[in-house]
């Protein structure tokens, strides 16, 4: 590759502004999903407005948890309930792993804190659990896909039709590999992710859809595991991002961990027992600390009580708001650094910000609100939108824009979060697209060879703000070969960077002399799933869906058989029913039959739905004729078992 003297800028820099127009190739419905670290949320734009949808328990946010217990997979609230009982079998916080390398320092830290096993699979962090006593490994994309699938099911239940398309949000500071991994998770879940939208941009859509006059807003998005800040200007339907910054590993989970560490030390000092030695104990503490943190947003003191947390010891401690704030003071103040950075990048004074919009559950913390208010010289943050639902709300609006649902005049101009470039001689980071460039965008630059008769050039693509590539993040690399022999500096190699509307980068290199070119969509070549892996995971996801369906049918069939047995037993033994009217021989026949059925149930716990249905038929074939015979006798007013709630038009 040529040095700085050897390359010249060619062609153009084109900022192709992303106008969020209708896409006629996509057929609805399209749902909007906030795929969160700790909770997820789904919405849909319908009949001119956004509906945030309830899950099967009536809640509008669903825990991003997946559990594998006794051969059964659970997602959401049911999975979170398993966390204290089966900590190694319950997976959460997977958003902190997706798109990362196993040797990332953040992954190394998470491995010490998360109760489930994280293993190295070709340089990528994978999750290992036991399913039917066999170790089974999942990529983070697969776990995220299970959460996305849950969101899809919630939407399908509401809409009454299949859903294949979605807009999914990601932290603005997610890098290229993390964005691609999120798209892969969508594919595994059977969803075509038609657009990836940055979380603070989605929140701005939720806040400013009806704003007609020019308004500058700062979105402060502090969730369970990630943190973003963006400055946008909204002007009559145009949403332009001026700057974005953040930390993809800072959020409510970190605040919880500080409190847990404090109590773990206190408990060890009092009882000489380390709670970290018992994963169940840690999960019990994690659950109660999260509840305590939420309580402290409305009260100044709360009690944490955990019966038999470990070895017969009870846990009983008070947590005050003041202590919680003291334990997390440095983390709270750390959130101001990205705020300062976006103001500097956007060349904005604090006084130019018209509105401060708080998003994410962690912004309910009073100290966070106070720190922001103090930083902006007493300006009150806007609390007009639900911090838990705003991002999904904005994603649903974006879905409506794509479908042309009365929102054709809305325009989004988002930006790249990090500078993109290639390595040139000496390990220099040569920048092609600077951070906070409006996307989609395209930039070309011409380079040359470093040595005489050099037959190939290696294109190494990085993202980051440092001068040397060793201090930045390698996204991927490829080689352009077949360059004709020539003196150094003579061949002209044009490198073109294209960032699409989802913030995903494509790089192409062309030898201008021969016209030969090569390109790749940069996705962290060591971090992304291959096409074959994705297809296998899609098949695995379908298999899991079939297993879930079979399990539901099995449970339903077992319940039907068990209910029939109990109902029949009550019918022949209850004096208010048929106990005094049934002949002893018939009664013995029924009791023997249902006793045999009970024994069969106990001895065939693994029986499938068909076997259970067949057993019910066999029991009914013996019992029902006897009951029908009795039912026809004078004074026998009790209907046959199983018929109590049946409506009939016949007399």
Swiss-Prot record:
Cellular compartments per GO CC: endoplasmic reticulum membrane
Region called Substrate-binding (SBD), residue ranges: 397-496
Acidic residues bias spans: 642-651
Matches recorded under PROSITE patterns: ER_TARGET, HSP70_1, HSP70_2, HSP70_3
Record-listed ATP binding positions: 36-39, 95, 224-226, 290-297, 361-364
Motif mapping: Prevents secretion from ER: 648-651
The reaction(s) this protein catalyses: ATP + H2O = ADP + phosphate + H(+)
Ranges for region Nucleotide-binding (NBD): 124-277
Claim: Hydrolase is one of the keywords in the record: yes
Entries under Pfam families matching the protein: HSP70 (PF00012)
Annotated stretches, region: Disordered: 631-651
Domain of life of the source: Eukaryota
This enzyme's EC code(s): 3.6.4.10
Coiled coil region boundaries: 534-622
Any one GO MF annotation of this record: hydrolase activity
Compartment annotation: Endoplasmic reticulum
Main location: endoplasmic reticulum
Keywords associated with the record: ATP-binding, Chaperone, Coiled coil, Endoplasmic reticulum, Hydrolase, Nucleotide-binding, Signal
Signal peptide coordinates: 1-21
Protein activity control: The chaperone activity is regulated by ATP-induced allosteric coupling of the nucleotide-binding (NBD) and substrate-binding (SBD) domains. In the ADP-bound and nucleotide-free (apo) states, the two domains have little interaction. In contrast, in the ATP-bound state the two domains are tightly coupled, which results in drastically accelerated kinetics in both binding and release of polypeptide substrates. J domain-containing co-chaperones stimulate the ATPase activity and are required for efficient substrate recognition.
Subunit structure: Interacts with PK4; the interaction is disrupted in response to stress.
Family named by the database record: Belongs to the heat shock protein 70 family.
Protein name: Endoplasmic reticulum chaperone BIP
Organism: Plasmodium berghei (strain Anka)
Gene: BIP
